């Protein structure tokens, strides 16, 4: 279970058991549950001890604009792994759209450690050619065998990066070169797309002001809400601008000759 945290100033709200004890509200969502915690400042100060007691060692998501209270030991939830999953889902959705218009899409998938073999299998139906760049040759050899059994074709596996120049799309969940780990899909011209706050549709039950991606990630990782594993972004970001998945797919098709 996880919790969300809101900190506010003002008079004691109805239902607060004591003057400075946080309000804890249990909520059900996506087959799991979490606690919505509202902590009130008195004269600009929080009762850190009572806040820590209310939260315990559970992962916590703070409302946007709220920094962890100074001196408060919180287990802040990290959505980094889920953001990579969301990026991969979004990349697959983009390629699926693009494949309706272009069949000659070649994709380079960079996975040095071999931890994303399952995603490589998703590339085969939507890309004419798939190239896997990895140091985990053995893991991907098994993946290639499965792909051949399922699709009659297998990705080309290599530990060299030269193939990137031949590909219309590069997908790298852990980053590539100067790009940070949240950059997932980009063209050879180094225009790339990534996910960030607000890129997915509102998740039912997400408290106001809480990042929807963080909330979906917590439901998936802490509450086993498996349907969150299939979400894709509604848009991705490039150059500070929002682009729909359809627009990204169109751009890829224009880049491919």
Model-inferred region functions:
Residues 156-211:
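Rossmann-like adenosine-cofactor binding region
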Residues 15-21, 70-76, 122-123, 141-150:
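Short, aromatic/basic amphipathic alpha-helical patches
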Residues 21-26, 39-50, 146-168, 175-177:
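A short, well-structured beta->alpha microelement
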Residues 188-257:
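Adenosine-phosphate binding glycine-rich loop
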Residues 13-14, 66-72, 116-118, 137-144, ...:
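Short, charged/polar "capping" segments at the starts of alpha-helices
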Residues 77-94:
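A glycine-rich, Thr/Ser-enriched phosphate-binding loop motif common to dinucleotide/cofactor-binding enzymes
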Residues 7-70, 257:
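Metallocofactor- and cofactor-centric catalytic cores in central/energy metabolism, strongly enriched
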Residues 100-162:
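Glycine-rich phosphate/diphosphate-binding loop of Rossmann-like nucleotide-binding domains
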């Amino acid at each position: 279970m996880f919790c969300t945290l809101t900190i506010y100033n003002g008079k004691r709200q109805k239902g607060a058991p004591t003057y400075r004890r946080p309000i804890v509200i249990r909520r059900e969502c996506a087959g799991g549950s979490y606690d919505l915690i509202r902590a009130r400042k008195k004269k600009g100060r929080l009762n850190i001890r009572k806040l820590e007691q209310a939260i315990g060692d559970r992962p916590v998501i703070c409302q946007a604009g709220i920094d962890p209270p100074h001196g408060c030991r919180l287990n802040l939830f990290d959505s980094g792994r889920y953001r990579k999953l969301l990026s991969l889902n979004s990349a697959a959705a983009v390629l699926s759209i693009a494949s309706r218009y272009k069949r000659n899409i070649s994709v380079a998938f960079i996975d040095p450690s071999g931890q994303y073999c399952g995603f490589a299998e998703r590339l085969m139906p939507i890309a004419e050619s798939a190239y896997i760049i990895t140091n985990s040759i053995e893991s991907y050899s098994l993946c290639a065998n499965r792909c051949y059994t399922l699709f009659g074709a297998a990705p080309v596996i290599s530990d060299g990066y030269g193939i990137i120049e031949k590909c219309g799309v590069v997908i790298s969940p852990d980053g590539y070169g100067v790009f940070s780990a949240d950059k997932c899909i980009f063209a050879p011209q180094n225009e790339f797309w990534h996910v960030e706050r607000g890129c997915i549709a509102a998740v039912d039950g997400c408290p106001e002001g809480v990042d929807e991606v963080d909330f979906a990630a917590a439901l998936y990782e802490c509450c086993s809400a498996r349907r969150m594993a299939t979400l894709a972004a509604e848009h991705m970001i490039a150059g500070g601008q929002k682009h729909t998945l359809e627009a990204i797919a169109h751009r890829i098709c224009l880049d491919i000759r």
